[in-house]
Amino acid sequence: ALERLQWPVYNPEDGTGAIRYLVVRTGFYSKQSLLVIVSTQPRLPQVREFVDLVRKRVPSLCGVVLNLNPHQTNVILGARNSVLWGNDHIIEEVAGLKFNISANSFFQVNIEGLESIYECLDQFLNPQARDIVLDAYCGVGSLALYMARKVKRVIGIDECQAAIEDAVVNSDLNNLVNTTFMDGTVEKVLPT
């Protein structure tokens, strides 16, 4: 589709071109896919045609997002997203928990590894109903929400605002009322 539409690919040497990356997030169990077009430009020509071409080839596609990253940097994603079609996230379900995962949020890519981490949490921490858990750098809440089903309260902290927003949504998706999520660095959020 890129060749067909002749979208100029980004050249990091001189900063020319529009398309920096194409990022695909796919749910391991849900099989939903989100395509993120990382561009140096806020608008792309023939974007509807591009979306239609991709949708025909990827039936599991649930959304296409344009991410703006105009800076000459090795950071992949910029801060600003706009939905070109569909959803701005995928939904994944792991260990009976539903997770809303957006373009800029961190989520464990190795789901079987995440399930093993859950087993280790149970084995080594032996969470109890009276416990209060702090999840520093919680991302979308994958560990925090797992623990929230077992303990009195969970507090999650992350400096990525998109991840915190997803964590709050995920807590609601799973009907968990014993969670608090805070945006900021751990060093600034926690009292010394």
Segments from the language model and where they lie:
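Rossmann-like S-adenosyl-L-methionine
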Residues: 46-48, 52-56, 60-192
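Extended interfacial segments that mediate partner engagement and assembly in macromolecular machines
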Residues: 1-11, 29, 44
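Conserved phosphate/pyrophosphate-binding and hydrolysis machinery centered on Walker-type P-loop NTPases
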Residues: 12-16, 111
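Short flexible coil/turn linkers enriched for glycine and charged/polar residues
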Residues: 28-31, 60
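Short edge beta-strands and adjacent turn/loop segments
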Residues: 15-29
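Short, aliphatic-rich beta-strand segments
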Residues: 24, 31-40, 98-102
